[in-house]
């Protein structure tokens, strides 16, 4: 069964190892094939936008997902998650789900779980900033001083 994808004007999508850019009008595609990685632009992180530990994990999983040889990213991935679990042990259930999906070869589901890790990280940051307002003010001072 073909996957139906609707693209907004100028939206990009990765199909396999190709980037497809839509023109200035909406487009509807039917993609037929098995085990072809497909990522919409909104789901793609770049090294520049992967600016937190959880986003770096997502980037590593994303690179596994689109790579013909996902194992090339395993070292990076496992180093990142080791550091996260050491710093935030409560993240283990999410990391475990990502790990299981990677080991089972379900990299798309691992990518979805990596999104949950990003959301969890954002939740923890929000809680920290709510209870440590000075930390947020210090962060603003550093960014304006640069």
Curated annotation (Swiss-Prot):
Keywords: Bacterial flagellum biogenesis, Repressor, RNA-binding. Pfam families: FlbT (PF07378). The keyword Protein transport does not apply. InterPro entries: Flagellum_FlbT. GO terms for molecular function: mRNA 5'-UTR binding. It comes from the Bacteria. The keyword Repressor applies. This is Probable flagellum biosynthesis repressor protein FlbT 1. It comes from Bradyrhizobium diazoefficiens (strain JCM 10833 / BCRC 13528 / IAM 13628 / NBRC 14792 / USDA 110). The gene is flbT1.
């Amino acid at each position: 069964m073909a996957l139906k994808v609707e693209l907004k004007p100028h939206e990009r999508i990765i199909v396999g190892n190709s980037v497809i850019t839509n023109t200035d009008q909406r487009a509807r595609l039917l993609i037929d094939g098995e085990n072809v990685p497909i990522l919409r632009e909104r789901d793609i992180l770049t090294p520049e936008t992967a600016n937190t530990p959880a986003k770096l994990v997502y980037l590593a999983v994303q690179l596994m997902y689109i790579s013909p040889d996902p194992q090339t990213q395993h070292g990076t991935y496992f180093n990142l998650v080791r550091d996260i679990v050491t710093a935030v042990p409560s993240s283990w259930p999410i990391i475990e789900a990502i790990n299981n999906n990677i080991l089972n070869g379900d990299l798309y589901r691992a990518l979805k779980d990596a999104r949950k890790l990003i959301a969890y990280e954002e939740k923890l940051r929000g809680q920290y900033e709510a209870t440590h307002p000075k930390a947020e003010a210090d962060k603003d001072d550093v960014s304006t001083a640069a």
